[in-house]
């Protein structure tokens, strides 16, 4: 993979993701990071990991020293329920942040777990409270064994409309679907009737703005 990236100058950003890259020991992880960081056209490294939420003791001072050496590095984690935001999890995120690495969150919309307005609002506000920015809310993919967790898109859109009223802009994620093939992540925007009416009311302003 390192060889492929080194021969593909169009690649400016490399993501280390699932499985979970933090399941490597420190030496192995640094070997991987240093290999990609040594490629001149790779400008940004990203890590995707559930570890801060489920194994926060893995975020050690030594690990953070390693991560700090490879900035600009962005860290995306995944909290799916407010109960996961424990004191240990918050401290783990804070250690990463103190190393100068931004921490964002990518949740998955899960039926019976976080698909109620109260649960989702508590999750998003809780993340903002520990300086973790809610970045994406993924519509649950049709993966094997996950069917019972899937909602329909309409449920997700209604949920986004409700939590928009109880969260600040910094706490609102993008609701996206990761489409198969090369389309990638597609934003799903809730346009409730009140919003549609408001847009129609001010249509002349937008149409004639210079």
Model-predicted regions and their roles:
Residues 157-210:
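C-terminal accessory regions of radical SAM enzymes
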Residues 1-13, 19-167:
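Conserved AdoMet/S-adenosylmethionine-binding subsite of the radical SAM
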């Amino acid at each position: 993979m390192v060889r492929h990236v080194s021969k593909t100058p169009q690649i400016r950003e490399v993501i280390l993701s699932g499985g979970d890259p933090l399941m490597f020991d420190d030496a192995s992880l640094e070997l991987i990071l240093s290999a990609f960081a040594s490629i001149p056209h790779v400008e940004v490294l990203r890590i995707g990991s559930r570890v801060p939420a489920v194994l926060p003791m893995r975020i050690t001072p030594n690990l953070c020293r390693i991560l700090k050496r490879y900035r600009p590095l962005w860290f995306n984690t995944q909290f799916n329920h407010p109960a996961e935001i424990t004191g240990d999890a918050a401290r783990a995120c804070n250690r990463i942040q103190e190393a100068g690495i931004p921490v964002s969150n990518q949740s998955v919309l899960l039926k019976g777990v976080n698909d109620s307005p109260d649960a989702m609002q508590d999750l998003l506000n809780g993340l903002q409270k520990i300086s973790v920015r809610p970045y994406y809310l993924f519509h649950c993919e049709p993966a094997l064994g996950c069917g019972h967790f899937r909602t329909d898109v309409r449920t997700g859109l209604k949920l986004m409309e409700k939590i928009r009223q109880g969260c600040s802009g910094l706490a609102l994620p993008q609701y996206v679907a990761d489409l198969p093939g090369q389309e990638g992540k597609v934003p799903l925007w809730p346009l409730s009737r009140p919003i549609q009416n408001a847009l129609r009311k001010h249509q002349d302003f937008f149409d004639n703005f210079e």
